[in-house]
């Protein structure tokens, strides 16, 4: 599980969906939550917030990633790789700190990932969980 500390920068709400912008270090992450300002008092601009997401929800790419709908894209390098028969655990050094990604070992091999490989870590906005 990945957990980051941030600060809410902006909130756009329509019906029961809120699109929340969170400043984490030098980057801005985006979350889509099925909560509104009325039932989630912690969702206020300027409030500190914890951003949580599973390691299996961190997508890894090599090379440029310009034409993709994912908004949460973080440049980084692979710090360590622990490869198992089916799955591999990657520790990533990104602009907002260390992240963990768990991806299929076959993908590690296909992408030729190694320690110090430059990567882009991506997380879908609806996979971010926001807590106080």
Regions found by a protein language model. Name each.
Residues 19-25, 32, 89-95, 101-102:
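Short, acidic/hydrophobic/Gly-rich beta-strand patch recurrent on exposed beta strands
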């Amino acid at each position: 599980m990945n957990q980051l500390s941030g600060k809410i920068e902006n909130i756009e709400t329509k019906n029961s969906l809120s699109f929340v912008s969170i400043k984490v270090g030098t980057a801005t992450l985006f979350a889509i939550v099925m909560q509104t300002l009325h039932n989630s008092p912690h969702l206020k601009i300027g409030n500190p917030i914890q951003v949580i997401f599973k390691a299996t929800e961190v997508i890894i790419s090599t090379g440029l990633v310009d034409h993709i709908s994912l908004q949460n894209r973080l440049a980084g390098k692979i710090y360590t790789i622990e490869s198992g028969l089916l799955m591999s655990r990657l520790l990533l050094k990104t602009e907002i700190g260390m992240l963990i990604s768990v991806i299929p070992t076959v993908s590690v091999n296909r992408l030729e990932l190694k320690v110090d490989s430059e990567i882009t870590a991506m997380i879908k906005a609806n996979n971010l969980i926001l807590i106080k």
